[in-house]
Amino acid sequence: MTTSLLLHPRWPESLMYVYEDSAAESGIGGGGGGGGGGTGGAGGGCSGASPGKAPSMDGLGSSCPASHCRDLLPHPVLGRPPAPLGAPQGAVYTDIPAPEAARQCAPPPAPPTSSSATLGYGYPFGGSYYGCRLSHNVNLQQKPCAYHPGDKYPEPSGALPGDDLSSRAKEFAFYPSFASSYQAMPGYLDVSVVPGISGHPEPRHDALIPVEGYQHWALSNGWDSQVYCSKEQSQSAHLWKSPFPDVVPLQPEVSSYRRGRKKRVPYTKVQLKELEKEYAASKFITKEKRRRISATTNLSERQVTIWFQNRRVKEKKVVSKSKAPHLHST
């Protein structure tokens, strides 16, 4: 079985890769590629198996079996004119199922591609072969990832539409055999990082939360409930509520933290006598008078000013109370 792969790189001539499955089919694929020549140095791949083929690609120097190789053929075999240098680039990959595991040739080095190019690669994992591809702009129906099992896993079938692939760019899909060795541990959150964990083409966005085996804290004093602690106990200790009625949160001393009024210090009789004398002389104090009273009474100028203000308010209240009965009587 021979399948052609068409590429449109930046080179003057587009290239075609021929993928062969067995040595018996090598002669069939070699007949169509006899017209190619001079392009073997442009790409990389594996050496050919039949003498009638185009010059083989020995640039990579990779050792592959002669029954499973890719050869480089010139584009004019298809009967199409060569693509210009400035033409928009694109590449199309077609997945080829292989009956045997891990017998893939190394892909040729991809030329510098634009944002609409397709990158394909493969790597062996255990006894199986995984071939994955990053697609930016694909218009054909194809698989984003081909899995070639070793001996007991069949190849999952089903193709994805092109529009589904374009919306799921740079997405990997891994199949059940890869995740079968993983076992979710109880009490932990298993959030899916890769959108596609199973072989199903649709992406999976849910998170597995296996909590059936979860057990709360085992307290030594026999409490049968969970304990919740506040992260900001130092700042909001009064908001913390304990599920246990006998637990009381520690309350900090309010007097040490709260900025309240200073303790009232009463004036002495000598100070009050001096202040009353000055108030009787004048209800309003001047700057020079305030300094003199402050020096004689050992009080600050602010204290003297406040006392005079309070004294005027007190006198005003006394006068208003004395006038109130006189108004009611008339």
UniProtKB/Swiss-Prot annotation:
Record keywords, A-Z: Developmental protein, Disease variant, DNA-binding, Ectodermal dysplasia, Homeobox, Nucleus, Transcription, Transcription regulation
Location(s), subcellular: Nucleus
Biological source species: Homo sapiens (Human)
Keyword Nuclease: no
PROSITE patterns: HOMEOBOX_1 (PS00027), HOMEOBOX_2 (PS50071)
Similarity comment: Belongs to the Abd-B homeobox family.
Highest taxon of the lineage: Eukaryota
Pfam family, one: HoxA13_N
UniProt disease link: Ectodermal dysplasia 9, hair/nail type: A form of ectodermal dysplasia, a heterogeneous group of disorders due to abnormal development of two or more ectodermal structures such as hair, teeth, nails and sweat glands, with or without any additional clinical sign. Each combination of clinical features represents a different type of ectodermal dysplasia. ECTD9 is characterized by hypotrichosis and nail dystrophy without non-ectodermal or other ectodermal manifestations.
Protein name: Homeobox protein Hox-C13
DNA-binding residues (ranges): 260-319
General function of this protein: Transcription factor which plays a role in hair follicle differentiation. Regulates FOXQ1 expression and that of other hair-specific genes.
Cellular component terms per the entry's GO annotation: chromatin; nucleus
Gene Ontology process terms (BP): anatomical structure morphogenesis; anterior/posterior pattern specification; hair follicle development; nail development; positive regulation of DNA-templated transcription; regulation of transcription by RNA polymerase II; tongue morphogenesis
